[in-house]
Design a protein with these regions (language model features):
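Glycine-centered secondary-structure boundary/capping sites
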Residues: 20, 164-165
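Active-site region of PLP-dependent enzymes
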Residues: 46-52, 59-162, 168
Length: 168
């Protein structure tokens, strides 16, 4: 199906890993190599899934993770990209574009955007990733704020101190 959809305008193949399952990345990468295409994985619904001993999001040129409220790792907004060392993409350029085009402090080499996640949201994502990777998240069935588990996820971090404020 993928090869039949490739045209002269095609620049990338974007497989979407769903329900903790990883697409057949060896086959997809082989097709991409044959046609000189980039592979960009959408890994939002398969955080922590593996194939051939490698994590989803690290099986191609670029892995993307959404942290939107319905995703496995949830910070209400934002996301993350991963660029493996063997990627054909320019990781320093991508990093600069996500950081307002800066290649170093006050040096803007590219037209860029502010795609930086706020530090408290990074902490939330990091906390959930740690729980998820150690199996605690799946055992507890943590999913989101409706479960009332964010205080546990956030306050379990040494960098965060809970204020002793009551509702009085």
């Amino acid at each position: 199906l993928i090869e039949a959809a490739i045209s002269p305008k095609t620049k990338a193949i974007m497989p979407v890993h769903l329900f903790g399952q990883v697409c057949e990345m060896d086959k997809i990468n082989k097709i991409a190599k044959k046609h000189n295409l980039v592979v960009i994985e959408d890994t939002s619904q398969s955080f922590g899934a593996e194939q051939n001993g490698k994590l989803a999001g690290m099986l191609s040129d670029l892995g993307t993770f959404s942290f939107q409220k319905t995703k496995n790792i949830n910070t209400f907004e934002g996301g993350m990209i991963c660029i493996p060392k063997n990627s054909k993409l320019d990781a320093p350029k991508i990093r600069a574009i996500c950081n307002q085009g800066q290649t170093s402090k006050y040096h803007h080499e590219y037209l860029g955007f502010n795609f930086r996640l706020a530090e408290p949201l990074c902490l939330m994502a990091y906390s959930q990733m740690k729980l998820h990777m150690t199996g605690i998240k799946s055992e507890l069935g943590l999913r989101g704020p409706k479960d009332g588990h964010y205080p546990y996820v956030v306050y379990d971090q040494p960098a965060i101190k809970k204020l002793g404020i009551t509702g009085d």
